[in-house]
Design a protein with these regions (language model features):
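Pyridoxal 5′-phosphate
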Residues: 5-425
Length: 425
């Protein structure tokens, strides 16, 4: 779907009986993009159940109505046109759609957004796949080298790092991240880890922790590690699309992204980035000959993917661009602050990411200090208050991950629920 058709579809889907205007047209008239009036026009772009409040957008994001509609049309098209859409070099109709061409257009959109080359990125099925390919494929390790990761990394990535002991013969060290987190101690934990483990060759860094929502100073960590001769693999599953940053300025080498969380594409799509001059440092999954050694796509050969899901990336990017990443960044912080501010001076409740604006977006974990069983707390929130969350058992915490479909009023209801539960302990 091209941008003009997408915007037309958006307006048609969002029509309301307010003076005959469409929501998209109304949104364009509202100059204050921080106002709840403006954000209600965005919320109305989502089909949200009314029998619970969904504050668990961190597992996967919700497609907006225009993106969902486009995805359904993509599915119908791929199904009906079948392998003709691939072409296989035999379809010569000049007007025929071609998946290879459209895939290339989507790569170009993603590359432009990141400020990188299309030959430095490849689409995967999720961030986990991207990260597994990078970690297991990193071929600069030799027996006796050390790799580091922290206790705030994503669980599957921890397992993948531990697997390097059997795969590469490395020593694997887990670092403990201090709480409360500060800008300085998030750098220091890796700096000290490298100092204490002089054979360190690789570290895994999670840009935004799925456990706490803490955003680490990745640019400084990358610079420090590079100065020590240490490579960095970065997990950006939760920061991409939720947090405004200049990716190219970070000067990273190896990164895994998710596109169905905060970007809002259909479920089942991610992205892998390898800096052009580092591609050879990640093993190929399959080789068709010596000439493919320079190509990133041979590091992520997953077989036939769901093409309709891939096509939905373009529609999701259009939708986000109509809002603007700076506005999205501010919105997520506003949603977080709306409930977190109620507990900054409350000794009963611990907020697990700091007030430093550089270190949080929307995703935030809390715990009620009198309750050790996070699962029971999560159950209470859903059973008694109809609030859907996820729990972080090792922290006795409940993670709050609002999406663009959430309102400030829903954050107030969350705060009221936490206060009531805490008062009963």
């Amino acid at each position: 779907m091209d941008r003009r058709k997408f915007l037309t579809s958006t307006a048609a889907l969002a029509s309301v009986s307010l003076a005959g205007q469409t929501i998209s047209a109304k949104a364009q008239r509202i100059l204050d993009h921080d106002s709840e009036e403006y954000w209600q026009t965005i919320i109305d772009q989502y089909e949200v159940p009314d029998h619970f409040i969904n504050l668990n957008a961190g597992h996967w994001g919700m497609m907006s109505k225009p993106v969902l509609d486009a995805f359904i049309e993509h599915t119908k098209f791929v199904n009906s046109h079948n392998s003709q859409y691939i072409g296989h070099g035999v379809v010569t109709d000049p007007d025929a759609r071609n998946y290879g061409k459209e895939y290339g257009e989507i790569l170009a959109m993603l590359a432009k957004r990141l400020g990188v080359g299309t030959d430095e990125i490849v689409i995967t099925r999720n961030a986990t796949e991207s990260m597994q390919l990078l970690i297991s494929g990193y071929n600069k390790l030799k027996a006796g080298d050390t790799v580091l990761y922290t206790d705030k990394a994503y669980g599957t990535m921890m397992v993948e790092m531990r697997n390097l002991k059997a795969l590469r013969g490395t020593n694997v060290v887990q670092l403990k991240v201090p709480h409360p987190a500060t800008y300085e101690n998030q750098i220091a934990v890796f700096e000290q880890g490298i100092k204490e483990n002089p054979k360190t060759k690789l570290i895994l860094v999670t840009h935004m922790s799925n456990q706490t929502g803490v955003i680490v100073p990745i640019k400084e960590i990358q610079r420090m590690a590079r100065g020590c001769g240490v490579d960095v693999i970065v997990d950006m599953a939760h920061s991409f699309g939720q947090y405004d940053y200049d990716f190219a300025d970070l000067d990273l080498d190896f990164v895994g992204f998710n596109l169905h969380k905060w970007i809002g594409a259909a479920l089942g799509v991610g992205l892998m980035y390898i800096k052009k001059d580092r591609i050879k440092d990640i093993d190929k999954k399959l080789s068709f000959g010596p000439d493919d050694n320079e190509e990133i796509r041979f590091r992520a050969l997953t077989g036939t993917m769901n093409m309709a899901i891939v096509l939905s990336i373009k529609d999701a990017l259009y939708f986000l661009d109509d809002i603007g990443i700076k506005h999205i960044d501010r919105r997520f912080k506003a949603l977080r602050d709306q409930w977190v501010k109620e507990f900054l001076d409350d000794d009963r409740v611990d907020i697990l990411n700091p007030e430093d604006d550089r270190m949080h977006a929307g995703l935030t974990t809390f715990r009620i200090n009198a309750i050790e069983n996070a699962r029971e707390l999560g159950k209470t929130l859903y059973r008694d208050y109809r609030i859907n969350t996820t729990t972080i058992g090792n922290l006795s915490g409940v993670r709050i991950a609002p999406g663009l479909h959430n309102s400030l009023d829903e954050m107030d209801k969350l705060a009221a629920a936490i206060k009531e539960i805490a008062s009963k302990q």
